[in-house]
Swiss-Prot record:
Cross-link (Glycyl lysine isopeptide (Lys-Gly) (interchain with G-Cter in SUMO)): K8, K9, K24, K25
Protein name: Histone H2B
PTM field: Monoubiquitinated by the UBC2-BRE1 complex to form H2BK123ub1. H2BK123ub1 gives a specific tag for epigenetic transcriptional activation and is also prerequisite for H3K4me and H3K79me formation. H2BK123ub1 also modulates the formation of double-strand breaks during meiosis and is a prerequisite for DNA-damage checkpoint activation. Phosphorylated by STE20 to form H2BS10ph during progression through meiotic prophase. May be correlated with chromosome condensation.
Flavoprotein keyword on record: no
Record key words, sorted: Acetylation, Chromosome, DNA-binding, Isopeptide bond, Nucleosome core, Nucleus, Phosphoprotein, Ubl conjugation
InterPro entries (UniProt xref): Histone-fold, Histone_H2A/H2B/H3, Histone_H2B, HISTONE_H2B_site
Keyword hit for Phosphoprotein: yes
SUPFAM superfamilies per the UniProt record, alphabetical: Histone-fold
GO molecular function: DNA binding; protein heterodimerization activity; structural constituent of chromatin
Cross-link Glycyl lysine isopeptide (Lys-Gly) (interchain with G-Cter in ubiquitin) placement: K131
Amino acid sequence: MPPKAADKKPASKAPATASKAPEKKDAGKKTAASGDKKKRTKTRKETYSSYIYKVLKQVHPDTGISNRAMSILNSFVNDIFERVATEASKLAAYNKKSTISSREIQTSVRLILPGELAKHAVSEGTKAVTKYSSSTK
């Protein structure tokens, strides 16, 4: 005897057991298909190396750079980035704002970098923002 209409469940695309949220796996580890051996995947290290190299080639096309020098420059860029971001965050908090705008970045650059260097940095930053704004319209 066929089941009554009230006893039937509506058809679903996925089985009931698959409705659970998928389990999170470790990002740095992958298990091999055979045996208990575990294969680790390399974690990506994000650096400014490619950008530093491009700028170097624009300024001095025939000059190279060692890995050690590239590492030092990368650390330098990370340090300056962190200082500017921290200062901009403080400025936004002082003004009771939850968003860091170009104004906070500009002010933090003026506070962190000395004299002429700050003027050039602000000038180049303004130029970059203007170029970006005109290209997105």
